[in-house]
Amino acid sequence: MGVCVERTRAHHGDQPAGRTETNDFEPGDIWYFPRGHAHVLECLGNEPTHFILIFDNGYFSEFGTFSITDWIGHAPKSLLAKNFGLPESAFDGFPKQEVYFARGAIPPEQIPENLQGPRIAPSQTHKFRMLSEAPHGVFKGGREWRVDSTRFPISTTVTGVILDLEPGALRELHWHPNADEWQYVIEGDVSVTMFGSHGRFRTELLHTGDAGYIPQGYGHSIENVGSKSSRILIGFNSGIYQSIDLSSWVAGNPVDVLATNFNKPESLIRVFPRKDVFIAPSK
């Protein structure tokens, strides 16, 4: 999954059925390319583009892929000539190794036509305008945009979230039963806690440009400890979003069970929230 920070253009070169798609992306738009599908990214205009990539496997590297230049550069000219029905001389001067970044003319504003190939069906588009949509949830202390395969069908292995927190606000203690969580602080200063079995508890401060990681099933929270609003990009290695919040867990238990577990009077238990908090505002 890619998250556009500055304007860019992405071309999905080929599905197994030969369908193609080219889209322009504005800040807040996202794309998803299934594993093994060809694609290319271009900068539009005179300013640099900026995007953040999320992979569903922490062992994967961007450098673990191969490019069209690398493949053609290593294939014999005789083989290429037969493949494309061209003379061998047509491949004189082609790069002999991978061209990772290629500098060319600024792409035209209008998306050009492909050499051939049917367009991808709208239901399988690789583009989703996340920040152009209304937030998934709005709270006193912040808001959240979320997209998974229920809204973006092609994104079968990754869920994307953008979380805004006001100063002092807390994304409450919670855990994800089906996925690991990767965090990138786009802006702000946040405190992230993590809790595991056998009393393991840790707190880390993350600042703009820092990344964090929470293993599947570990309890955690995110709190804005700065003086300005914070924005966090969050990725999950599952196409279905699942979360269990601590307030919801408490609210779902009988009062007498909680009172017994905590050895506290039922009168105290009854003042706990009886619904999901999700984001708690600053006191």
Spans of model-derived segments:
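A short hydrophobic beta-strand segment most commonly corresponding to one strand
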Residues: 46-65, 213, 228-246
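Short, surface-exposed secondary-structure edge patches
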Residues: 1, 22-23, 162, 182, ...
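Glycine- and acidic-residue-biased ligand/ion/polar-headgroup-sensing regions
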Residues: 1-17, 167-170, 176-197
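A short, N-terminal "cap"/entry segment at the start of jelly-roll beta-barrel domains
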Residues: 79-166, 172, 248, 262-283
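Conserved metal-binding segment of the jelly-roll/cupin
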Residues: 5, 24-46, 54-56, 165-168, ...
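Short coil/turn segments at secondary-structure boundaries
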Residues: 14-17, 45, 65-67, 175-178, ...
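Short loop/beta submotifs within extracellular cysteine-rich repeat domains
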Residues: 9-12, 18-19, 40, 48, ...
